[in-house]
Every structure is written in structure tokens, then in C-alpha cells.
């Protein structure tokens, strides 16, 4: 069980004499969930949802492979193709591999429809959430599949690959006059069987053996005679799986990155590839290497940001469409009902090569800010709040001897701190993690919420302590007081800047360090400092006036776009 925690976490727990087994059992761990969920978006009507529920209930003690085999056989019999040689081989191979047992099968199986995936839906419903999470195998709704395949035209001779095809959604939905031009790879033998069955049903007028290989696309070597042999590739690769692949192509621990890069190299020049990715590929630091790969090839031509979701997946997701080796000067972005174009230069604004999807007016504002800026927070002092290791034991709700107040992120508001609700005995040696004392005891410092999609900074000149839900900044910007820096960070313009450049749900030191600051004269510095004092000590609201000054500093005459 201990393998699911990091070495750093284990060291911290050892230091605090934590019972690791009890701690792990108390953690919410989706990978161990035994819950079953039916992905209803894959079916057309409620009758089939009820039928799947009945099958699961009646065959709750049966093995998954036995249930899938018998339902597949019923589907094939419904179309009168079960006696074809190629179909018999598919059934016999699966029967032999899984030692399929006969079932007293209950359930009236519907006729096959290319508009839904009954067999794949049943399989997903039979798998526990924990198993799907470990595999990263959540199948893609046809609505999204169809959108990703739009513009793919195989005709009679062009070929298509799905390198992690699951039950075959992309293979079923792409249009071709020759099913032998369709290729899929899937390492789950049950899913690969379903994909084969779905294809022979979808192309029941053809006598053929589907080109579905049951193997691991990343680990099992080369499946094809030569590189650059495919015209089209599209898929939804596993997300969240850490890859153990050692590749000469790219250095990454994310499996979806390896799926993409290996697929890209199997695509011919001029071929098209469309991948479904977690939205985090746009901005998270750990995905910088794949963004650099994409930028270097300069053939990404479309990003589609989806507002929908599908069963089992809470992560926001996007699709990226590439036209290999065809230079693209900009990238079309589709977002809800909006369409706009982003220049590749927008991907170079940050050190981590964040894909900032800026509309033209937004990019104009960003460029103006960058052109006026000469400083950053990179030379400032930073610290984390205290990690006690046991808040229940070490935090007190009332004051007492040797105790002092300690603030949490919940008490941080723009500019000011609410009253502290907790007290602590400041014994540095007893804490799991603690910063230098002179940081906490600084004459003045800024504190900010760490888990937030908003920049919320407060001023502290009371040398107070803070828990780790708050982080600490002692800024060093030439010509600016600490309070003036506070004014900039709490402004609408800097909120806009942070959102557009980084798009994070957390306020990270690395991102804050890159925020650009202008050179200002002493008059503006004094003016902003005075306004912050009026907020801190006079109870006045000076946000509007602060915003107006900062807009003027950057010569932005129409701030409505950032509000």
C-alpha cells in the first residue's frame, strides 16, 4: 500500500511518527473505488440503460469476460454473421484466451447500431471506477469523437490509426469505403475483442478480419513496417497514467505525451492527427516538454476547448489538431460558440511556454504590459506558511499562555486580514515544515492564498505567523514600496494578466516571479501607498482609483476587457 505515496511524504510521516497504514486508509483514493457507473451518454435510449442494469444485476457473480462474450455473440447472431469464418475466429480466439464459461444468459440484446456502443458501454459499466481510473480508460462519447474526426476523409485508399482504440469508437465513426484501412491497437484484451466485434458489425456487408492488435502501443515495440505510414490518426489516450517508457523521442513521465509523440512519428508528412488531452497540457509546468515539441514543429492548427464532460472524467479537456509538417502561422481556437486565432508568439510569453489562448484585444493588452515592464518579483523573498504535521493537536481555538495567533488562507482578504481564529505554540522543532524565523517576523510582508484562481494578497506588519494555506512574499521591486506592490498584485489588470498568462487554479511562486512590473516615479508610488493606507487604516474602498492609476501606467485606455 505504501507505494502510492511519494518518498517525501513518507519521510514527513516518519518524522511525525504517523501510522502510514491508517493514514493511507483514511485518504480518499479513487483508484481503489469499487463503485460502478453506467456511462449513459454512449446510449440512445433509457431502455438500453435499464437492460444494462438488468444484465449487471443478474450476472453480478459472473466474470466480466464471460458476460461480454455472450452479449457479443447475441449481437452477431442478431445480424446473422456469427458463422462467417472471420467472425468465428474472433470468437474462438477470445474463448480460448479467456477460457470463457457458458452462462445461462438473461436479457434481450438489441440490434446493433453505429449510433451507439452498447457492448462498450456494458463493459465500462461492469468495470469498477477504481479499475477504470488505474487504466485511465474512460471511453469517448460519439459527439466528441465525431467532432474530432470532422475533416478526416479516407476515401478508398487512405488509412487511419487509433493507437489506444478501446472499444473502437473512433474506428466505428470514421467514414471509409474499405474497413481494412482502419487500424487499432489496444492493450486490454476484452476491449480489443469488443472493438473487433463492433467493426464487423459496423461493416457487416464486408467479409474481413479487423486490423486490431492487442498490445501495448508504448511498450511492445513496432507494429508497423515503416514510420510515416498513416494518413490520419485520432484517439483519446489514457490520462494520469505515469509512463515507465524510456524514449529517445521525448523525456516525459506522462503516458499521453508518449502516445502522442509516437503517433506523430507514424504519421506521414501532410497527414492529420487529432488527440484529446487534459486541459492541463496548456499550462502545467510538467507538460512544458510537450509544448516545446509542439512549438518546434509549428504545425498545430486548431485547439478545441470543450465545455461538455463525460462519465467518470472531472478534468476539463481539449482536442488538438495537427497537419504534420504543414507550417501553421497561427492556431484556430474553438471555445463554446466562439472562434478566434492565436499567434504562435503567444506561446513564448512565459518560461514554461504556456499556451496562452489570447483573443486579439487580450494579446494587445498583454503586449502593452510587457513593453512597459522592466522588473519582476524574481529577486524577492518567498516562504511557505507553517506545516504543523498535526493541526488538530497543535492548533487552539482560544488564546492561552505561550500561545500566539496564527492565520490561515481563509483569513486573507484583498489588502486586509480578518481576525485570526487559531492560536499556536511556536515550537519550530515540532513542525513538519517551517520557514526562516526572520521571514515570519519581518516588519512588513505580503501574504496570499495559495489555492485560489484569484490573486488575493493581504498586508501584515504585525510579525504574525501563517499556516501553509497561506504563502509569504517580501517584495523587492525598485521604486515601489511593499504597499505599492500590493496595489499592483490586487489590481484587476494583474488578475487579468495572471489568468491569461498562466491559467492556474493555484497561485504559484514560479508564476508570480514572472509577473512584469513597470518603472514608476515617486509620485505614483506615494499615491498608491497612500491609497493602500486608506484601505488598511481608514476602511475606505480605493480599488477603483488604484485600478485607474495602474491602467494609466500601462497606457491602457479601455480597461473593460479585463474587468
Where are the regions that the model predicts?
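Class I S-adenosyl-L-methionine
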Residues: 74, 78-149, 494-501, 509
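Non-catalytic DNA-recognition/assembly elements of restriction-modification systems
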Residues: 347-391, 410, 519-563
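Polybasic, glycine- and aromatic-enriched phosphate-binding surface used to engage nucleic acids
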Residues: 1, 267, 364-524
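Active-site-adjacent bridging/hinge elements
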Residues: 42-52, 116-128, 239, 243, ...
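Conserved hydrophobic/aromatic pocket- or pore-lining residues that grip, position, or stack substrates
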Residues: 122, 148, 195, 448, ...
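Signature of N6-adenine DNA methyltransferases within the class I
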Residues: 1-11, 143-144, 165, 171-172, ...
